[in-house]
């Protein structure tokens, strides 16, 4: 053993070889020397049996030392976990160096026979099987791996070459060494070329491609953790160069030439980007278009091999690798591997150039033929348009022969157009006649191919419709109706000029709106005549279906309108246009032609105060008539009145009917007095518009919906417990009756009480008084301080009288002070202009009260009645009705603006009539019951009578009364100023009561009305 072996007695490669499973169980060959046995690294067994077993094991596992088995085991182990090329190179190099010690030891021992003889003669040959856990060289790996090229190219190069050559020469001599030599040959062959073949089989699938770890972005493949992007190409280039160096000294000609062929083939596969040798040109798609760029590609490949482009990560190297071998889709492995790359798209421009040459010749012929056909078609279309225009303008029905002629035109045009498309079916036809400026596309010729009526498609009214600002497409819609049967008479003249024209989109929308605005007041005969005329005209299929839809909508509207459940919402601007319909309605009411189910819903306006009041009044009258006829029994009405599930409004109507029916039996003259009812129905609704304007939010609902809403007024909803309403209930209910009676059936009790006290004429006008009191919003301050004048001393004796009576708290002349207690403070929503009729609230004049003290009992009785009705009706109206108001601010303002414009003058007249009636009730001897308008002295007296209030009495009453809470809310200075009349006059129309304001705050999360 010379010094060279001593220096390499336990080399780094031996430690590297311990990483393999097969090698780690075997002792390195150099460990058999006696110098190493003293170190005690290895456990030594000197048993002969163990030696024989170990020798058999070593002889059996000689080929275990060969890298074939290790490579096979490596391939199997690497298939599960993808390792980098660097780790593969480390293992192969360790295997290489370990293999080079085998021939030297075999030369010493001289073959298997010498081995066996020496082992059997008891030489101290150590056991090859070791415990690999006794030494761990894994922590030495990084340092060895960094210097592996220095080791391979340095001291061991001569020794390795000598070993290989001696092994090769030895392998050609004897039988048993020849097996070893062939083993070594194949071992080196495998060392150099198993890895490329392994790369071949693994690069076919990018999952196992360890030779090139690049993979397509987004393909879902994970990059290996040990892969380094920076010097990867350098490693592959160095590996290929070293493989060439290692194969060149081998003298084995056939195997080396075969391996060089394999290596060059693999290199061409790896770096050329295509299967050059394997795949014929016909099957590769990219050879059809890449022939120009092959030289450029080769330059790119040379640059890649030499490693001059370290950052170009062989973007197109994988496209053809697995192309026809494993049939993997191209997008799996091909494509960009980093975000810095771009994709080349080849061949499309060449394809387009080739196709353009073949297509342009056909196009020229086609365009010439198309021009001829289009010119002929245009002349035919002009003729057919003239015929159709004549037929449309002068005849309503097209004759059958003209229809056949136009149909023939349609068929020929279809045939011509299809014949144009057929000559070149196999090629993509790109007919663009707009490229030729002479041949513009005729849309009429194209659209006439549709099997519609030509009279619908082409007419001469397109200029008109364009001037009207209609849509481009509106000329293919024709109005089949002479006039829409849903129109009002005012709309018919406006649409008369469009009878034979084609309606625009706006006209169609207007027709849809008119279907909603349909009313039965219009003569139905005209609508039926319109329909019969329309059905005679020729109708296209599409427009016929559209018109049928309109007719269905109209019939639905006709079905809904007799019922009381579908009243459409219409703008206030439409109300001004249809005031004459209201006059028609009042005329029919006075004539007695309008029945109850058709009430107020047939009118296309929203239910104003007059409509709601008239409907309620006519319900009462209709029920009274049925009572007289015997259709409805008195007992049934009483049962309904006692039924707790009956809505409050229904109970109100029933109670009124029972009262009037009982009084009509006593005084049958009243029911037959038409003048009183005429005054009520026509004049009274304008005076109480404020009260019923609160029900305007129910304009889209029917009467039973209103009743259901009102029925919730008695329920303890959160709306019933605003602070002002609770305060008003605490003070108002103590005046006349116990509150428990009001909780059960307040309206009925009050009406029964009034039936015992007051006369017939008072009962007839009782809803008017109730509504009049409900008109005034609840004013804490300001109600009753409208016109406080200098005549404060007139009623001082009457004041002292009425204060002594327990029932009466205020004078009869101070009607508004009743409301001054029960109505809330106004919240001003507009200017401070005073209401024109606000001073006319008192029905009793000062001079008549002073001149006639005889009628003081009548006065007290009337005041008691007013007080009773007020205390309950204010409870009902401000609770039951106002509770159902969603947002009183919006519609209150809206309705007030509209109502002030239209009904202002009639308000004053009707109020004068009402207060004249009230005055005649309280003074029957002085004023005969003339049903007409009251004399002009009433208005002056009313203004006088409004100033009868005593401010000192009011202030004393407000502060001293234990039931009044005003002193808790307002300072004495403000109360004194208010009682002195220094607060501004309030426009009641623009005032919102405190109670309504509190409810609107509670409703602030509800529906918002603009």
UniProtKB/Swiss-Prot annotation:
Ranges spanned by the short sequence motif YXXXXLphi motif, renumbered to the chain: 10-16
- A GO biological process this protein is involved in? negative regulation of translation
Q: Where is this region: Disordered?
A: 154-182, 196-277, 289-320, 354-391, 921-960
Q: Which Pfam families match?
A: EIF4E-T (PF10477)
Instruction: Give the record's GO CC terms.
Output: cytoplasm; cytosol; nucleus; P-body
UniProt keyword list: Cytoplasm, Nucleus
Role this protein plays: eIF4E1-binding protein that regulates translation and stability of mRNAs in processing bodies (P-bodies). Probably plays a role in P-bodies to coordinate the storage of translationally inactive mRNAs in the cytoplasm and prevent their degradation. Acts as a binding platform for multiple RNA-binding proteins. Required for the formation of P-bodies.
Q: What is this protein called?
A: Eukaryotic translation initiation factor 4E transporter
* Originating species: Drosophila melanogaster
């Amino acid at each position: 053993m010379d010094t060279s072996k001593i220096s390499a007695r336990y080399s780094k490669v031996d430690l590297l070889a311990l990483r393999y499973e097969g090698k780690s169980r075997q002792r390195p060959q150099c460990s058999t020397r006696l110098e190493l046995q003293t170190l005690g690294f290895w456990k030594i067994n000197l048993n002969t049996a163990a030696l024989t077993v170990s020798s058999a094991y070593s002889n059996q596992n000689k080929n275990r030392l060969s890298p074939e088995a290790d490579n096979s085991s490596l391939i199997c182990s690497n298939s599960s976990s993808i390792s980098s090329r660097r780790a593969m190179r480390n293992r192969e190099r360790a295997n290489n160096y370990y293999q080079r010690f085998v021939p030297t030891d075999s030369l010493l021992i001289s073959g298997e026979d010498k081995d066996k003889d020496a082992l059997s003669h008891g030489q101290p040959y150590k056991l090859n099987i070791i415990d690999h856990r006794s030494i761990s060289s894994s922590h030495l790996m990084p340092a060895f791996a960094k210097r592996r090229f220095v080791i391979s190219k340095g001291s061991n190069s001569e020794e390795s070459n000598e070993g290989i050559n001696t092994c090769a020469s030895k392998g050609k001599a004897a039988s048993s060494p020849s097996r070893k030599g062939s083993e070594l040959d194949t071992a080196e062959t495998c060392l150099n070329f198993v890895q490329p073949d392994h790369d071949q089989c693994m690069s076919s699938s990018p999952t196992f491609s360890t030779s090139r770890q690049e993979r397509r972005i987004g393909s879902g493949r994970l990059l290996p953790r040990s892969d380094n992007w920076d010097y990867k190409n350098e490693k592959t280039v160095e590996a290929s160069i070293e493989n060439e160096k290692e194969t060149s000294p081998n003298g084995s000609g056939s195997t080396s030439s075969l391996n060089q062929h394999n290596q060059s083939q693999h290199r061409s596969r790896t770096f050329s980007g295509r299967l050059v040798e394997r795949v014929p040109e016909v099957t590769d798609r990219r050879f059809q278009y890449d022939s120009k760029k092959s030289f450029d590609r080769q330059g790119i490949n040379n640059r890649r091999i030499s490693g001059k482009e370290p950052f170009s990560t062989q973007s197109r190297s994988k496209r053809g690798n697995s192309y026809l071998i494993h049939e993997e889709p191209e997008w799996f492995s091909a494509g960009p591997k980093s975000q810095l790359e771009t994709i080349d798209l080849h061949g499309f421009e060449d394809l387009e150039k080739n196709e353009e040459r073949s297509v342009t010749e056909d196009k020229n012929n086609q365009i010439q033929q198309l021009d001829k056909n289009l010119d002929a078609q245009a002349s035919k279309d002009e003729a057919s348009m003239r015929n159709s225009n004549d037929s449309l303008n002068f005849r309503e029905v097209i004759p059958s022969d003209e229809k056949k002629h136009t149909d023939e035109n349609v068929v020929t045009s279809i045939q011509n157009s299809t014949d144009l498309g057929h000559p070149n079916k196999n090629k993509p036809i790109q007919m663009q006649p707009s490229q030729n400026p002479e041949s513009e596309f005729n849309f009429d010729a194209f659209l006439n191919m549709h099997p519609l009526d030509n009279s619908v498609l082409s007419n001469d009214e397109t200029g008109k419709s364009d001037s009207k600002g209609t849509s481009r497409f509106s000329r293919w819609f024709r109005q089949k109706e002479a006039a829409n049967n849903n129109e009002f008479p005012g709309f018919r003249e406006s649409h008369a000029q469009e009878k034979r024209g084609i309606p625009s989109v706006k006209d169609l929308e207007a027709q849809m709106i008119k279907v909603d605005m349909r009313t039965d007041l219009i003569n139905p005969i005209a609508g039926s005549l319109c329909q019969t005329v329309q059905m005679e005209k020729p109708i296209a299929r599409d427009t016929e279906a559209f018109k049928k839809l309109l007719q269905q909508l109209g019939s639905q509207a006709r079905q809904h309108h007799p019922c009381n459940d579908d009243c459409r919402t219409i703008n206030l601007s439409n109300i001004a246009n249809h005031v004459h319909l209201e006059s028609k309605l009042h005329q029919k009411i006075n004539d007695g032609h309008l029945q109850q189910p058709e009430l107020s819903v047939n009118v296309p306006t929203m239910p104003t105060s007059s409509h709601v009041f008239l409907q309620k009044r006519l319900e009462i009258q209709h029920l009274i008539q049925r009572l007289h006829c015997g259709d409805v029994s008195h007992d049934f009405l009483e049962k309904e009145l006692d039924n707790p599930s009956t809505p409050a409004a229904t109970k109100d109507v029933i109670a009124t009917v029972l009262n009037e029916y009982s009084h009509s039996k006593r005084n049958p003259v009243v029911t037959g007095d038409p003048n009183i009812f005429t005054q009520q129905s026509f004049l009274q609704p304008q005076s109480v518009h404020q009260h019923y304007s609160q029900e305007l939010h129910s304009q889209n609902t029917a009467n039973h919906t209103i009743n259901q809403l009102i029925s919730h007024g008695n329920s303890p909803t959160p709306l019933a417990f605003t602070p002002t309403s609770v305060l008003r209930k605490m003070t108002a209910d103590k005046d006349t009756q116990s509150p428990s009676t009001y909780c059960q059936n307040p309206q009925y009790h009050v009406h029964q009480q009034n039936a015992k006290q007051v006369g017939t004429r008072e009962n007839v006008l009782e809803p008017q008084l109730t509504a009049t009191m409900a008109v005034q919003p609840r004013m804490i301050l300001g109600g009753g301080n409208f016109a406080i004048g200098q005549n404060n001393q007139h009623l001082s004796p009457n004041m002292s009288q009425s204060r002594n009576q327990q029932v009466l708290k205020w004078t009869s002349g101070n009607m508004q002070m009743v409301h001054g207690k029960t109505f809330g403070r106004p919240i001003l929503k507009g200017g401070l202009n005073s209401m024109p009729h606000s001073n006319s609230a008192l029905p009793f004049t000062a001079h008549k009260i002073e001149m006639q003290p005889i009628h003081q009992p009548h006065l007290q009785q009337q005041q008691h009645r007013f007080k009773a009705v007020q205390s309950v009706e204010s409870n009902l109206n401000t609770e039951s009705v106002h509770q159902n108001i969603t947002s009183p601010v919006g519609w209150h303002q809206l309705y007030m603006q509209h109502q002030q414009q239209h009904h202002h003058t009639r308000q004053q007249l009707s109020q004068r009539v009402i207060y004249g009636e009230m005055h005649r009730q309280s003074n029957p001897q002085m004023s005969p019951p003339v049903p007409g308008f009251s004399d002009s002295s009433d208005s002056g007296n009313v203004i006088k009578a409004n100033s009868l209030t005593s401010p000192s009495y009011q202030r004393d009453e407000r502060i001293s009364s234990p039931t009044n809470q005003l002193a808790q809310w307002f300072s004495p200075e403000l109360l004194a100023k208010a009682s002195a009349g220094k607060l501004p006059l309030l426009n009641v129309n623009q005032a919102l009561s405190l109670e309504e304001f509190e409810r609107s705050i509670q409703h602030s999360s509800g529906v918002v009305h603009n």
